[in-house]
Amino acid sequence: MSGFDDLGIYYSDSFGGEQPVGDDGQAKKSQLKKRFREFLRQYRVGTDRTGFTFKYRDELKRHYNLGEYWIEVEMEDLASFDEDLADYLYKQPTEHLQLLEEAAQEVADEVTRPRPAGEETIQEIQVMLRSDANPANIRSLKSEQMSHLVKIPGIIIAATAVRAKATKISIQCRSCRNTIGNIAVRPGLEGYAMPRKCNTEQAGRPKCPLDPYFIIPDKCKCVDFQTLKLQESPDAVPHGELPRHMQLYCDRYLCDKVVPGNRVTIMGIYSIRKSGKTSTKGRDRVGVGIRSSYIRVVGIQVDTEGTGRSAAGAITPQEEEEFRRLSAKPDIYETVAKSIAPSIYGSSDIKKAIACLLFGGSRKRLPDGLTRRGDVNLLMLGDPGTAKSQLLKFVERCSPIGVYTSGKGSSAAGLTASVMRDPVSRNFIMEGGAMVLADGGVVCIDEFDKMREDDRVAIHEAMEQQTISIAKAGITTTLNSRCSVLAAANSVYGRWDDTKGEENIDFMPTILSRFDMIFIVKDEHNEQRDMTLAKHVMNVHLSARTQSSSVEGEIDLNTLKKYIAYCRAKCGPRLSAESAEKLKNRYILMRSGARDHERETEKRSSIPITVRQLEAIVRISESLGKMKLQPFATETDVEEALRLFQVSTLDAAMSGSLSGVEGFTTQEDQEMLSRIEKQLKRRFAIGSQVSEHSIIQDFLKQKYPEHAIHKVLHLMMRRGEIQHRLQRKVLYRIK
């Protein structure tokens, strides 16, 4: 309790010229309290046919009997009962909320009589407010809104521990022991200014010294309070600017309502407090009237629901009807896939996989309390210039909750969570990173291969268990990170080298098995495809400024975003019995196929086929069912999920040594290529040159296939060991 004696924490609440309340003011307050009491007692819902129910009276009684001394009042109900009352509460919430709480206490006293023995004294009631008005933005808060009710959306990124704050204090003079009791302390982060002088005058006693008063902790009345840090939503931040923050003050039953990572909408009073200690030097006197702002919270709505999904915002019945029509289309899967990044040509399978990732499977809670993730993770590996980053950028815009980050610019703490010291209390607090903020959405990680190995290991738990466990600086806790991961990476050699096989992939099997689908994207040379691609790119550049009509069958971005949010909120399909049986048989075949391949090549694949991959196919099937708003994933969905898995992960696993258009390279072919290379290096020394035609003829005489000779020459040129000279007729060895 020694903290109460520290005089430095009490701030003056005398900012602004408040007038003393006279008889008129007291009469007006009594009148307003009476009207608030009538509202709580008489407001009713229902019609003549169905019968009326007294909404707030019944709610007060129910809450009070359960030992929950709070009630939530809707501003729209208050406005329909008495518009002036609602206006007073909007314009001057600090004093009128106090009157509303006193009125609620009086009504609770009436409706809960007779109370059991020992509970005769009525408890104080906390009134929370909620409103359906359009929310403002942290950036739009100006001095005009000071001391008004505001509604702000955002993400909670930090929360302090719950502490006690005095609401009524008793002070005593050190010298003459004069006690002043029951002094009300203003709510919020403002404190109380202790009197400088003791006014007690006793004959024959010296005057009391300056600052004689101290607080008697035992006679103080305290409530719980907690401060939160709110960051504005990523979609509200203008491009190129940092997200802004706002400090929140919660008390009583509003404490411990939210955790870092929750998306919330706050109803609160925009308030000010003294901004730290200012130095007495001349240059700082200009800051005397400057106050820092915070919001005193009077209501919290958590927008991320229990399953970690973004609640489908305000969807109108017309939109719902449109979504139902859309889901009933037989080609909805193709339509959604075409609507993903329409400016990027081709990559149809990758777009279909991204569609599955956006909709996601169903999260399951098992009877023993464990959970199975429903989110799909996707990795794109391959050549530069294959529109990987463009797809990631589109997904960030298209997902209801999307966070984009680049591998090199992301640390383990930035992706998961960091522990830092609170500048006010000097205690350690925790701030959530990208994967916590994207709870219920998608994290896009570009340049995944450029990340440090230590940072990549940090997201192992987040990808499979969908939690982030922290044990730092005395804080041991677990945060939710129920999000999909879409990652893009390049090959070790920059471009994909077909002869190197698995050496192209520089990832551990532990991280690869956490991805449901792994696509190897190659920039293949094909004249017809190159021509079509060039035409498409030219059209995109030429019609960039013109507002062209959407391609046939496409859904516009806003509709797609709302449709994804709607499907994720409303639908959680499961596998049907027939599709489960089919999937079981196919999985056994896949395992045996991968095992045979490993036996043939005498080396283990770095992309394993495990039970995780079986669960991956289940998730992909469920996401296809969710796209159509179906309760069960059918056999057709399982077929498509298996096909997607086949063209992505299975092909990548089997391509231990793919040799382009020639198909699989066996161990013998690999040995033959290495024999040709050794002979070639023996043929001519470093710094010498030989005719290319004569070398090819010599090897052909030794019965080596021509394509193998050309492949070895091509590889040695890419590695910079030989180069062409004299109009590409002569080969010159550099190293």
UniProtKB/Swiss-Prot annotation:
SUPFAM superfamilies, per database record: Nucleic acid-binding proteins (SSF50249), P-loop containing nucleoside triphosphate hydrolases (SSF52540)
Compartments (UniProt record): Nucleus; Chromosome
Assembly with partners or alone: Component of the mcm2-7 complex (RLF-M). The complex forms a toroidal hexameric ring with the proposed subunit order mcm2-mcm6-mcm4-mcm7-mcm3-mcm5. The heterodimer of mmcm3/mcm5 interacts with mcm4, mmcm6, mcm7 and weakly with mcm2. Component of the CMG helicase complex, composed of the mcm2-7 complex, the GINS complex and cdc45.
Annotated source species: Xenopus tropicalis
The EC number(s) this enzyme carries: 3.6.4.12
Domain MCM: 332-538
Coiled-coil residues: none
UniProt binding sites for ADP: 372
GO-annotated cellular components: chromatin; CMG complex; MCM complex
Keywords: ATP-binding, Cell cycle, Chromosome, DNA replication, DNA-binding, Helicase, Hydrolase, Nucleotide-binding, Nucleus
UniProt record similarity statement: Belongs to the MCM family.
Name of this chain's protein: DNA replication licensing factor mcm5
